[in-house]
């Protein structure tokens, strides 16, 4: 099985699978919105996407990434930002409502454990085993991957500048 090695506070942990390659088509998925409806990439057809993927909104770095992408999406308006985690849809909805974040679409993988494997992001060992690692994937309007970053240290934020530059 293909694995990536990343770190959590300097300690090595692993993920199963492989991050989608730049130039490939975004793998299919079915994820759950905060109203419990299901969505897939087809629901965003014709739009550029930023997939902001992370372990849980209940961590400072994950919450910071959602706030930052919400701000950037509001200023740009040229892409849909999907914030994807294993948090339950209720918690995601509450977080976004409380924080006033209305420029991102929170999505839960709780019904779709295969998402993490298909995207190479399921953590397979260590204290966060079973959650998703931190990554950002950017696609064009046809679903072609333009940028993919699996953040090498989970407690670090993604490279926002590179991700947003891929939208240009």
UniProtKB/Swiss-Prot annotation:
It catalyses: a hydroperoxide + [thioredoxin]-dithiol = an alcohol + [thioredoxin]-disulfide + H2O. Disulfide bonds join 62-96. Transmembrane segments: none annotated. One of its GO terms (molecular function) is thioredoxin peroxidase activity. CDD domains: PRX_Atyp2cys (cd03014). InterPro entries: Redoxin, Thioredoxin-like_sf, Thioredoxin_domain, TPX, Tpx_CS, Tpx_Peroxidase_subfamily. Keywords: Antioxidant, Disulfide bond, Oxidoreductase, Peroxidase, Redox-active center. It comes from the Bacteria. Residues 20-168 form the Thioredoxin domain. PROSITE patterns: THIOREDOXIN_2, TPX. The active site is at residue 62. Its EC number is 1.11.1.24. Belongs to the peroxiredoxin family. Tpx subfamily. Homodimer. The active site is a conserved redox-active cysteine residue, the peroxidatic cysteine (C(P)), which makes the nucleophilic attack on the peroxide substrate. The peroxide oxidizes the C(P)-SH to cysteine sulfenic acid (C(P)-SOH), which then reacts with another cysteine residue, the resolving cysteine (C(R)), to form a disulfide bridge. The disulfide is subsequently reduced by an appropriate electron donor to complete the catalytic cycle. In this atypical 2-Cys peroxiredoxin, C(R) is present in the same subunit to form an intramolecular disulfide. Thiol-specific peroxidase that catalyzes the reduction of hydrogen peroxide and organic hydroperoxides to water and alcohols, respectively. Plays a role in cell protection against oxidative stress by detoxifying peroxides. PANTHER family: THIOL PEROXIDASE. This is Thiol peroxidase. It comes from Chlorobaculum tepidum (strain ATCC 49652 / DSM 12025 / NBRC 103806 / TLS).
